[in-house]
From Swiss-Prot:
(R)-pantoate binds at residues 61, 153. ATP binds at residues 30-37, 147-150, 176, 184-187. This is Pantothenate synthetase. Transmembrane segments: none annotated. CDD domains: PanC (cd00560). Catalyzes the condensation of pantoate with beta-alanine in an ATP-dependent reaction via a pantoyl-adenylate intermediate. It comes from Bacillus cereus (strain AH820).
Length: 282
């Protein structure tokens, strides 16, 4: 595995690889890698001749009162996970390397961002789309891999790749969970011992809602109310949102039909956790 820290070198490598006909699987991350990231890397390894992993904590996608400075970082751990999962190139640029001067252009996302995390975090998805535009141009991937834990992000990325005719295949990958159902996340380290015991109830609330839908409930408000009440009963967390939308358009639905997403965000003392399920309802 080769570690690359400059845009120029990474671009030179990927241009040569693509010119020689090699397929490139790209996994963009902010580091502090866990089994969810490893799953993305293994899928990229299966489907491509070359695997590129980026580790970059992107300041553009953090708001003024968010956890940019304390976002967990451990490059030694990340290198080990990368090596264990078949990464060929680890792209690890500094902020100064990625943003050497003030940005004159950013990517503004105009759809699919006024709900869920986009509503709570204005500017977040503009930051995500801007850094991905840069990373796609640097790594020139054939395929790029994203976890469905950030399902809104996947919907936004699919839209922006289509809008700008970017020649990359977006590959969504199912959420990876702990044995008790908690979605794996770099931010889970912020949970207290008691909160960690409560956190699996987030996924249980979604499973309960899924059972109700499969049993015939089609009223979106009844389902989201059920989820909120369950989380408020079984955890000390504060429900930021529990919402149901058409997916991937993220349009409001009153009656549940077609492909939908049920998504939640819950604030604990030192961390905000998200989770979701997507399902197709006939």
């Amino acid at each position: 595995m080769k570690i690359v820290t400059t845009v120029q070198e990474m671009q030179h490598i990927t241009k040569e690889l693509r010119a020689s006909g090699k397929s490139i699987g790209f996994v963009p991350t902010m580091g502090y890698l866990h089994e969810g990231h490893a799953t993305l890397l293994r899928k990229a390894r299966e489907e491509n001749e070359i695997v590129v992993l980026s580790v970059f904590v992107n300041p553009l996608q953090f708001g003024p009162n968010e956890d940019l400075d304390r976002y967990p970082r451990d490059i030694d751990r990340d290198e080990n996970v990368a090596k264990e999962n078949g990464v060929d190139y680890l792209f690890y640029p500094s902020v100064e390397e990625m943003y050497p001067a003030e940005q004159t252009t950013t990517v503004e996302v105009v759809k699919r961002t006024d709900v869920l995390c986009g509503k709570q975090r204005p500017g977040h998805f503009a930051g995500v789309a801007t850094v991905l535009m840069k990373l796609f141009n640097i790594t020139l991937p054939t395929r790029a891999y994203f976890g469905m834990k950030d399902a809104q992000q996947v919907a936004v990325i699919e839209g922006f790749v289509a809008d700008f005719n970017i020649p990359v295949i977006i590959v969504p990958v199912d959420i990876v969970r702990e044995e008790d159902g908690l979605a794996k996340s770099s931010r889970n380290v912020y949970l207290s011992q008691e909160e960690r015991k409560e956190a699996p109830h987030l996924y249980r609330s979604l499973c309960m809602a899924k059972e109700r839908i499969e049993a015939g409930e089609r009223n979106a408000e009844i389902i989201t109310t059920l989820v909120k009440e369950y989380i408020e009963t079984y955890t000390k967390g504060t429900v930021d949102y529990a919402d149901l939308y058409a997916y991937p358009s993220l349009q409001v639905v009153d009656q549940i039909e077609g492909r939908i997403i049920l998504a939640i965000a819950v604030k604990f003392e030192n961390v905000r956790l998200i989770d979701n399920i997507t399902l197709t309802v006939k």
